[in-house]
Amino acid sequence: MTELNAPMRVGLRIKELRGGLGMSQESFAYSIEMSRTYLAEVEVGRRNVSIENVDRIARGLGVSLREFFDSELFGGKPLQSSEADGAAL
């Protein structure tokens, strides 16, 4: 199995969180004022994404940057709900 590079992991995390909200790529991109084409390329790992855009995406998904990156995709364990509620950056 091929190891996922950083852009692929970021894209998978976006797709995972967006899917959990039941939002299409198009409606989510519109809600954060981002091009659907750009978002699609980020989600498949074809585009590097700036930290500013990761922050914008995370806010649109209703999570903090800490929650966004606190995933097994990035080598961490997911926060428990009580930890997430009290987590501060």
Identify what each model region corresponds to.
Residues M1-G20:
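A short, Lys/Arg-rich alpha-helix, primarily the initiator
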Residues L12, E16, Y30, E41, ...:
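DNA-binding alpha-helical recognition surfaces that contact promoter or target DNA
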Residues K15, E26, D55:
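Residues within the helices of the helix-turn-helix
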Residues G19, Y30, R59:
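Alpha-helical residues within the helix-turn-helix
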Residues G22-V44:
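Short alpha-helical DNA-recognition segment
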Residues E33, E52-E67:
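DNA major-groove recognition helix of helix-turn-helix/homeodomain DNA-binding modules
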Residues R59, F69-L89:
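Short, charged recognition helix plus adjacent turn
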